[in-house]
């Protein structure tokens, strides 16, 4: 049990993943380099101003040449970063294409297996059997319809009408009055009087 739950999952990092990680690390290093150079250029520009104020024009000019060279380095660095990002995007898109192709291949294999189970011949056989069953039932219906005379048809319709009439007829309401029930709590002496009233009515 311990080995079962303690087993480490196998790494699913591919060579493409490693390449993407390495390219992104190089890109990040170049961006850090850009940031340092940009900060240095600001300092050198401020220093060149100070040198001009101090009357040291040649020194300021030399510093500006150095600054210009570093700006060119920044442009080259930006181009390198763009190339790295394009490479990363290309690899990532290729990975997506590979997954799509794997999905298409899996789907194609499933379709092939289904076609093996249900071939065209099998489908045609089932359709033929279905058509035969329908035709057989039609022939039975025709035989049954032709075996009855007009007298039989009339008798069947008459019986059907009688059954229908039985279902819709309701029982009649009784015309005789219901016998009057003498309440149990009426005194015994009063009961003959009630019987006389009923007879008189």
UniProtKB/Swiss-Prot annotation:
Highest taxon listed in the record's lineage: Eukaryota
GO molecular function terms listed in the Swiss-Prot or TrEMBL record: protein-containing complex binding
Domain notes: The acidic C-terminus and the basic N-termminus are thought to render the protein in a closed, soluble and inactive conformation through an autoinhibitory intramolecular interaction. The open and active conformation, which enables membrane binding and oligomerization, is achieved by interaction with other cellular binding partners, probably including other ESCRT components.
Tissue specificity field: Ubiquitously expressed.
Similarity section: Belongs to the SNF7 family.
Residue span of region Interaction with VPS4A: 170-181
Annotated consequence of substituting residue 170 to D: Abolishes interaction with VPS4A
Subunit structure: Probable core component of the endosomal sorting required for transport complex III (ESCRT-III). ESCRT-III components are thought to multimerize to form a flat lattice on the perimeter membrane of the endosome. Several assembly forms of ESCRT-III may exist that interact and act sequentially. Interacts with VPS4A; the interaction is direct. Interacts with VPS4B; the interaction is direct. Interacts with CHMP4A, CHMP4B and CHMP4C. Interacts with SNF8, VPS25 and VPS36.
Pfam families referenced in this protein's UniProt entry, alphabetically: Snf7
Task performed by this protein: Probable core component of the endosomal sorting required for transport complex III (ESCRT-III) which is involved in multivesicular bodies (MVBs) formation and sorting of endosomal cargo proteins into MVBs. MVBs contain intraluminal vesicles (ILVs) that are generated by invagination and scission from the limiting membrane of the endosome and mostly are delivered to lysosomes enabling degradation of membrane proteins, such as stimulated growth factor receptors, lysosomal enzymes and lipids. The MVB pathway appears to require the sequential function of ESCRT-O, -I,-II and -III complexes.
PANTHER family: CHARGED MULTIVESICULAR BODY PROTEIN, CHARGED MULTIVESICULAR BODY PROTEIN 6
Compartment list: Endomembrane system; Endosome membrane; Late endosome membrane; Membrane
Coiled-coil residue spans: 10-145
Name the UniProt record assigns to this protein: Charged multivesicular body protein 6
